[in-house]
Design a protein with these regions (language model features):
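Amphipathic N-proximal alpha-helical interface segments
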Residues: 17-19
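Long C-terminal interaction/binding lobes of large macromolecular proteins
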Residues: 23
Length: 111
């Protein structure tokens, strides 16, 4: 599914738009951690609670290392990540054929 990543600041993207064939209006939102250790601590806690939906991985577009988890809303996930790429006016748009350099394996309902 093609996605369009838009930004209004130095982050690679602030919002992404895509026509997924699912009833969700918002797929997920991201919380940015201060350290990679914060990501690890959050992963351990959410894994122990059985909330992980996608394992650790690194996105192709913004290079964020993150994982996904269920929220109290059945329709929205949270991405918890660290280390996103920043861009400026010299940034050139790049097309990617996959969402992750590594990881982000879906484990919904398996943990």
């Amino acid at each position: 599914v093609p996605a369009h990543f838009l930004h209004c600041n130095g982050r690679h993207h602030t919002i992404a738009l895509a026509a997924f064939p699912i009833p969700k209006r918002i797929h997920h939102f991201m919380l940015q951690a201060n350290t990679i250790d914060d990501v690890g601590y959050a992963f351990d806690r959410l894994d122990a609670a059985g909330r992980i939906t996608s394992l650790l991985g690194r996105h192709t577009n913004d290079h964020t290392i993150s994982f996904y988890a269920d929220t109290p809303s059945p329709m929205i996930e949270v991405e918890f990540g660290w280390g996103p790429r920043t861009v400026d006016s010299s940034w050139t748009v790049v097309r990617h054929n996959r969402t992750a350099l590594w990881g982000h394996k879906s484990v919904r309902g398996q943990r």
